[in-house]
Design a protein with these regions (language model features):
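Glycine-rich beta-solenoid repeat tracts in large extracellular/virion proteins
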Residues: 1-5, 17-24, 44-55, 78-85, ...
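Beta-strand-rich solenoid/repeat architectures in extracellular/passenger domains
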Residues: 1-16, 27-42, 61-77, 89-104, ...
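Short low-polarity hydrophobic stretches
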Residues: 108-110, 282, 349, 437
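Extracellular beta-solenoid/beta-roll
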Residues: 201, 208, 213-218, 223-347, ...
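Outer membrane beta-barrel translocator domains of Type V secretion systems
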Residues: 425-437
Length: 437
């Protein structure tokens, strides 16, 4: 179909033909329940083609598709939704299912194109709420913005899965990807990133919360290379599994609110920045040594350095703000040497945070004698740290004593673990009562 209107339609093509294509400044309107699939290479299910012409240099192709569309492609280089029209627009309403099988076949893509009629820019794609995007081939991204001025918008509760190597959930090279609340991204292949910008001209904006799952060691959950990735709408819940990386002046800025969970590490290179804001019982489970530009921790939120791989994890924070946060460390007080570390270059004046410990020394009994284990360096000396009772899930609660270095003959910029008190909890009392009876 090249121009016109359809209702409740089935379209199948092969051998390089597109199922639905609007060329130049044509408009296509299709009702609910469309099923469109292609089998050949470079065959798109929905395609807004070159929109610049000598008679209408600014008009773009327009395609509007109703609810519940099922779009699929099987060949290489075949996208379910392809925008290549100057000032064009594609709207896919809610509940669409988009699937690609071939290599280099994206779910939703906006590409720049240059021809004798001029260059293409400013295309827009809107994907409705509750839609799903799945790609299986290598180099096949869920959503790919590669057109100057393009805006690819995802409504709430869109799901994206990619299986192939180097297949990113979101990739912004030129243009903007906007994602509504409840976005769910899962990437499985080697070298695949959940949300990725790889040029200064690209950006990704989370307009609400998101779930991003990437456990691959050579891929990142969130990766900003030159561009920007932001999620600062507030009151949003993020669940992120995988690492974050900012390189070449790229920036990641996330407000993680309302029981958000981040399981992974962070890394910076070449003036990259990562700013994390943990509020209202949010949780960062640090899986290896990490560095962030700024970290806000408040409202009972926790930064847990005590991962299963062992101790001596170091988290470096250029600017720490907030108050009432919790930092949990793996420690071995008896050794006075082994333990995780928090290094802060600047902290908020008058702030207070709490310290929990998972101490190896307690496995074999009590820690006796005068001990001190360096945990925290605050180069600004603005923040205070207080040990807090922690329910370890066993027979005892644990209270660590944390003291500033100048009370121990050390630097006032440093904080030390000096004592661990074991206190009977309800479980201990129940067992003792049982023996007494």
């Amino acid at each position: 179909l090249y121009n016109g209107e359809l209702e409740d339609s089935n379209v199948d093509t092969s051998d390089g033909a597109h199922a639905v294509r609007a060329n130049f400044h044509a408009t296509i309107n299709i009702g609910d329940g469309l099923t469109a699939g292609t089998l050949g290479e470079s065959s798109h299910a929905v395609y807004a083609a070159q929109g610049r012409s000598t008679t209408n240099p600014t008009g773009g192709s327009k395609i509007n598709i109703g609810k519940g569309a099922v779009l699929s492609t099987a060949g290489d280089g075949s996208h379910t939704v392809m925008m290549a029209s100057n000032n064009g627009k594609i709207v896919i309403e809610e509940g669409a299912e988009m699937t690609t099988l071939g290599d280099g076949s994206h779910g939703v893509a906006a590409y720049a194109d240059t021809s004798a009629k001029g260059s293409v820019a400013n295309g827009a794609v809107e994907i409705g709420a509750g839609s799903t995007i799945a790609t299986a081939g290598g180099g096949s991204h869920g959503v790919f913005a590669n057109m100057t001025g393009s805006v690819l918008s995802l409504d709430d509760n869109v799901g994206i899965t990619t299986e192939g190597d180097a297949s990113h959930g979101l990739l912004a090279q030129r243009g903007v990807i906007e994602a509504g609340d409840g976005l769910n991204i899962s990437v499985e292949g080697s070298g695949s990133h959940g949300a990725y910008v790889n040029a200064a001209t690209g950006s990704i904006e989370f307009l609400g919360g998101a779930t991003i799952d990437n456990n691959d060691n050579d891929g990142y959950a969130i990766y900003a290379d030159k561009g920007t990735i932001t999620g600062t709408a507030g009151n949003s819940t993020f669940n992120i599994t995988g690492n974050m990386y900012a390189d070449n002046s790229g920036s990641i800025d996330l407000d993680m609110d309302n029981n958000s969970v981040f399981t992974g590490s962070t890394a910076l290179a070449n003036s990259g920045t990562i700013n994390l804001n943990l509020k209202n019982n949010s949780y960062w489970h640090v899986t290896s040594s990490s560095e962030v530009s700024s970290l806000h921790v408040s409202g009972g939120s926790m930064v847990n350095l005590s991962h299963e791989a062992g101790m001596n994890t170091v988290v470096t924070v250029d600017d720490l703000s907030g108050s009432g946060g919790v930092f949990k460390f793996n420690t071995e007080l008896d050794s006075e040497a082994n333990g995780d570390k928090l290094v802060i270059n600047s902290s908020e004046t008058g702030s207070t945070h709490y310290v929990h410990v998972n101490d190896l020394s307690l496995i074999n009994g009590e820690v006796s004698g005068e001990k001190k284990l360096h945990l925290i360096t605050d180069n600004s000396s603005n923040a205070s740290f207080v040990g807090e009772y922690m329910d370890t899930g066993g027979l005892w609660d644990v209270l660590p004593t944390v003291e500033r270095g100048d009370t121990l003959g050390e630097s006032a910029n440093e904080w030390y673990l000096t004592k661990i008190e074991k206190k009977e909890n309800g479980n201990t009392e129940t067992i003792n009562d049982g023996f007494a009876s």
